[in-house]
């Protein structure tokens, strides 16, 4: 049969059939009848289209190939024979330009005269049986069906045969000739008997041997073999059956499947209440750095040495005082803690040799700030079985918080470029195999786009702080160790730079389990006046500690310097993930890579270079109240990175729940956009599951707001 196909059909048709079989993982050496069927179908599609044009008056005309008028517009667009990605691109383009409804399955042709998609069928069985199978599969009035048989019969939707008698006769003659040629070679009977009904990809996959025996053994009760089960599944009408089963479960269960229409979804309800507050473990856009360039001091690289060197670059220290107290805390203790840090740093400088680490004196203010002796005494359960009113602590429900504009500002800032490089090329990892040449190119392009990004600074800052805190928690369990918050970068000129953001003082840290908490006090420099957005700084006590001279276009100006102080806590598992924040670079690189792969698949060549170097092209970045925001490929890289970084910085059960539940709604909306006519039951239950995750977390509230923008614009 394979030899016959190669002799009987045009080489271009044979090549397209080979590609189609390869795409579905089928072996043409084994599936020879299928190979012949695909070639026949392709040839009929091409013959259907051949010689048919539309003239300037919009009339359909038949023109032979050597006619000088062959530059007229083709009447039919051929979709069959293209790879799936390209075929869907063509279908989408036709739908966008003509307003045609998007089909669920790939059709074979589009008729520009009648403005409809056409599904061509070639059958070795009765035409009406094959027609009904096609119609049952497509379930669309907008796709026209035209079936031909090898016996000269045909059948079409509403008996509308589209083409003139002569064109159809040419197709029937060709099919009859193919049948005769096969019969002469003794191939026809095998070919005729091999046709099955309309198949899905899963049905084409034949299971044999051990896997077949396992499949037969793994069936639900009352099914003797896989064929019976398949026949049952194929004829299964889900809606009524599921409703019937659920109604047996409980009288309260009502699972009527409702159609999901453009008017069905409502916006997610965001909570009311006071504005949400900053809850990250360190300051983000409001952080201020004291920096040294080209560090070459003694002990360079030892955090405490670097910190002292950075502190010496600032000369505007003044007597600190509280400008924004913490509502519930003993604020003088925070002030005394900062004064203690300054005093003990001064003591170090007065020593002959600076130590590598510094353990703070266990003063009353630090004991209070670090919760020393505040934990309730643990009692073994066996010792209190007889206590009649034994119960857990009553815990208050968390207070609902509303979305505040500061979190969107934080995200926007994270997407921006800084004037420093925060990662070297090797942060994402070296090549392992020579095949990774393209991967290297993509990594280098991506690194160039994100190395200056503020989100990348947050990654390196997070990695440093979590590593230092976990080390100290293990090495100095009983000590109140002073940990400088440091990062390293390179300037535009390539000079090394060491930055100090502030200090952490670690509490007692006997961390046996992954979730055991170590308390710490963070003290971070900033130029942001907390009185501008006091709700953001609810958990902080803010001191004014100095005045900083800043150079600007109009000369020097003095700005007050603040210290943001708060008590916080973390655990071994959180620090472990914080140390691995570089994973965010990989995650966003993979997302960009899938975009490149999609583009390369359409163009059938690697598009990495064009993707990054075509500066004129814009890409969708995300939703906003204004609609879909577009930006350069660099902006897309930085936005994806910032999202990944914020997922790490603001990780919480609320985020986990919201991501999982909102994804279900997103998939239903996407199915609606793809014209898949989705149905749902208990949609309000899904909304409840989403909305119970919206409590007080700023990042979750912002994501919910973005989701509402997406709903608004997706369903227009």
UniProtKB/Swiss-Prot annotation:
Entry keyword annotation includes Nuclease: yes
Subcellular location: Host cytoplasm; Host nucleus
Domain of life: Viruses
One MF term in the entry's GO annotations: RNA binding
Residues where Mn(2+) 1 binds: 41, 108, 119-120
InterPro entries, sorted: INFV_PA, PA/PA-X, PA/PA-X_sf
Physiological role: Plays an essential role in viral RNA transcription and replication by forming the heterotrimeric polymerase complex together with PB1 and PB2 subunits. The complex transcribes viral mRNAs by using a unique mechanism called cap-snatching. It consists in the hijacking and cleavage of host capped pre-mRNAs. These short capped RNAs are then used as primers for viral mRNAs. The PB2 subunit is responsible for the binding of the 5' cap of cellular pre-mRNAs which are subsequently cleaved after 10-13 nucleotides by the PA subunit that carries the endonuclease activity.
Name of the protein this chain belongs to: Polymerase acidic protein
Motif segment (Nuclear localization signal 1 (NLS1)): 124-139
Organism: Influenza A virus (strain A/Hong Kong/1/1968 H3N2)
GO biological process: cap snatching; DNA-templated transcription; symbiont-mediated suppression of host gene expression; symbiont-mediated suppression of host mRNA transcription via inhibition of RNA polymerase II activity; viral RNA genome replication; viral translational frameshifting
Residues that bind Mn(2+) 2: 80, 108
Listed Pfam families: Flu_PA (PF00603)
Family indicated by similarity: Belongs to the influenza viruses PA family.
Cofactor note: Binds 2 manganese ions per subunit.
Primary location: host cell
Cofactor: Mn(2+)
Primary enzyme class: hydrolase
Keywords: Cap snatching, Endonuclease, Eukaryotic host gene expression shutoff by virus, Eukaryotic host transcription shutoff by virus, Host cytoplasm, Host gene expression shutoff by virus, Host nucleus, Host-virus interaction, Hydrolase, Inhibition of host RNA polymerase II by virus, Manganese, Metal-binding, Nuclease, Phosphoprotein
Motif interval(s): Nuclear localization signal 2 (NLS2): 184-247
A GO CC term attached to the entry: host cell nucleus
EC code: 3.1.-.-
Post-translational modification remark: Phosphorylated on serines and threonines by host kinases, including human casein kinase II.
Binding partners and assembly: Influenza RNA polymerase is composed of three subunits: PB1, PB2 and PA. Interacts (via C-terminus) with PB1 (via N-terminus).
């Amino acid at each position: 049969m394979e030899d016959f196909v190669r002799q009987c059909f045009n080489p271009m048709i044979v090549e397209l059939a080979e590609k189609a079989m390869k795409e579905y993982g089928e072996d043409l050496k084994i599936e020879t009848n299928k190979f012949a069927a695909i070639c026949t179908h392709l040839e009929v599609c091409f013959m259907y289209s051949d010689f048919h044009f539309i003239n300037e008056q919009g009339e359909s005309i038949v023109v032979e190939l050597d006619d000088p008028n062959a530059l007229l517009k083709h009447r039919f667009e051929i979709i069959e024979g293209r790879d799936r990605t390209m075929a869907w691109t063509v279908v989408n383009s036709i739908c966008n330009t003509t307003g045609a409804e998007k089909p669920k399955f790939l059709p074979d042709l589009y008729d520009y005269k009648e403005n409809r998609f056409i599904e061509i069928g070639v059958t070795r069985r009765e035409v009406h049986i094959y027609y009904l199978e096609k119609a049952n599969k497509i379930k669309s009035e907008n796709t026209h069906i035209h079936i031909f048989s090898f016996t000269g019969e045909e059948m079409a939707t509403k008996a509308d045969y589209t083409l003139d008698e002569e064109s159809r006769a040419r197709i029937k003659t060709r099919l009859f000739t193919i049948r005769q040629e096969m019969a002469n070679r003794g191939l026809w009977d095998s070919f005729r008997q091999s046709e099955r009904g309309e198949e899905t990809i899963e049905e084409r996959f034949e299971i044999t041997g051990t896997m077949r025996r396992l499949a037969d053994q793994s069936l639900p009760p009352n099914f003797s073999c896989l064929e019976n089960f398949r026949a049952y599944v194929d004829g299964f009408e889900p809606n009524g059956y599921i409703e019937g089963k659920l109604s047996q479960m409980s009288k309260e269960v009502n699972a009527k499947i409702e159609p999901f229409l453009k008017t069905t979804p409502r916006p997610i309800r965001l909570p009311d209440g006071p504005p949400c507050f900053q809850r990250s473990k360190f300051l983000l856009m409001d952080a201020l750095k004291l920096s040294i360039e080209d560090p070459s001091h003694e002990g360079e690289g030892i955090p405490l040495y670097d910190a002292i060197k950075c502190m010496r670059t600032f000369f505007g220290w003044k007597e600190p005082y509280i400008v924004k107290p913490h509502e519930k805390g003993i604020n003088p203790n925070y002030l005394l803690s900062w004064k203690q840090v300054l005093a003990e740093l001064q003591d170090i400088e007065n020593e002959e040799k600076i130590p590598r680490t510094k353990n703070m004196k266990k003063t009353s203010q630090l004991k209070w700030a670090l919760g020393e002796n505040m934990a309730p005494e643990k009692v073994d359960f066996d010792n209190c079985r007889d206590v009649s009113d034994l119960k857990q602590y009553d815990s208050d429900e968390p207070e609902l918080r509303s979305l505040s504009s500061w979190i969107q500002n934080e995200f926007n800032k994270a997407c921006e470029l800084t004037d420093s490089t925060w990662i070297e090329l090797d942060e994402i990892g070296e090549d392992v195999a020579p095949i990774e040449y393209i991967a290297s190119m993509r990594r280098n392009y991506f690194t160039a786009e994100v190395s200056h990004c503020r989100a990348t600074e947050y990654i390196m800052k997070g990695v440093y702080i979590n590593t230092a805190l976990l080390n100290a928690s293990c090495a100095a369990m009983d000590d109140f160790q002073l940990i400088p918050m440091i990062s390293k970068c390179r300037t535009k000129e390539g000079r090394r730079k060491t930055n100090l953001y502030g200090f952490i003082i670690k509490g007692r840290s006997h961390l046996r389990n992954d979730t055991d908490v170590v308390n710490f006090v963070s003290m971070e420099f900033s130029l942001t006046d907390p009185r501008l957005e006091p709700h953001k700084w609810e958990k902080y006590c803010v001191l004014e500690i100095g005045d900083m001279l800043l150079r600007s276009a109009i000369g020097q100006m003095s700005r007050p310097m603040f210290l943001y102080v708060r008590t916080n806590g973390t655990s071994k598992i959180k620090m472990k993930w914080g140390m691995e924040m570089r994973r965010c670079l990989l995650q966003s690189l993979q997302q960009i890579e899938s975009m490149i792969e999609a583009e390369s698949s359409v163009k059938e060549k690697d598009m990495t270079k064009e993707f990054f170097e075509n500066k004129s092209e814009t890409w969708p970045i995300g939703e906003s109240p204004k609609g879909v925001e577009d930006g350069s490929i660099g902006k897309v890289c930085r936005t994806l990175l910032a999202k990944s970084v914020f997922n790490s910085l603001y990780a919480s059960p609320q985020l986990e729940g919201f991501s999982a539940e909102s994804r279900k709604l997103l998939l239903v909306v996407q199915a609606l956009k793809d014209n898949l006519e989705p149905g749902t039951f208990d949609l309000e239950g899904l909304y409840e599951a989403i909305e119970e995750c919206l409590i007080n977390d700023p990042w979750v509230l912002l994501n919910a707001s973005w989701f509402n923008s997406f709903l608004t614009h997706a369903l227009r």
